[in-house]
Regions:
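C-terminal binding/interaction regions
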Residues: 5-24, 68, 77-158
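Basic polycationic patches enriched in arginine
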Residues: 1-2
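Compact, glycine-rich, soluble single-domain proteins
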Residues: 50-64
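Alpha-helix C-terminal capping segments
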Residues: 39, 68-75
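Short loop/turn motifs at secondary-structure junctions and domain boundaries
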Residues: 27-30
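Short beta-strand scaffold segments in enzyme catalytic cores
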Residues: 33-40
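Short strand-coil-strand connectors
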Residues: 41-42, 131
């Protein structure tokens, strides 16, 4: 693995923020709650939870909700890391399970666009609803040779 930065070696707070966000998931169809937490360059954190819709294609992933929140705050280019957790909800709506969750392909692409705006290769902390298991990646490992604005001849402004 690559040399670890502080954000890579201390994911506990970011994972905890993602777990707290997952408690706000609206997942009545899959009963699979996902939480995401974005670490911004100033140390602040923006979170999101998945929002399902009866028209399944309109559902929103937790990472996309968090990225949209960062964008609404004018902070899209400030994202340096993301933590994602998920699990099946128990009867009280609390996510459970020790299976490590990764961002889906769509979310990887959305995160990549934000990463390019900030000129960063985001750190991605993949965790579980319960337990201490965390797998850490660079976004470029999860989305190699990514398609982005440059492929369309667009130069990103920071």
């Amino acid at each position: 693995r690559r040399a670890m930065t502080e954000a890579m070696t201390q994911p506990a707070a970011l994972i905890a923020a993602a777990r707290a966000a997952a408690l706000n998931a609206h997942a009545p169809y899959s009963r699979f709650a996902v939480g995401a937490a974005l670490l911004l360059s100033d140390g602040s954190v923006v979170t999101g939870a998945n929002v399902e819709n009866a028209s399944y294609g309109l559902s929103l992933c937790a990472e996309t909700v968090a990225v949209a929140s960062a964008s609404a705050a004018g902070r899209l280019a400030d994202i340096v890391a993301v933590a994602v957790i998920g699990g099946l909800m128990d009867t009280h709506g609390v996510p459970t399970g020790a299976h490590v969750v990764n961002p889906c392909g769509r979310c990887r692409q959305v995160l990549n666009e934000a990463a390019q705006m900030g000129g960063r290769d985001l750190i991605v902390h993949c965790g579980a609803a319960e337990g201490d298991a965390v797998v850490i990646y660079r976004l470029s490992e999860l989305l190699p040779d990514a398609f982005g604005p440059a492929d369309l001849g667009i130069v990103q402004r920071r």
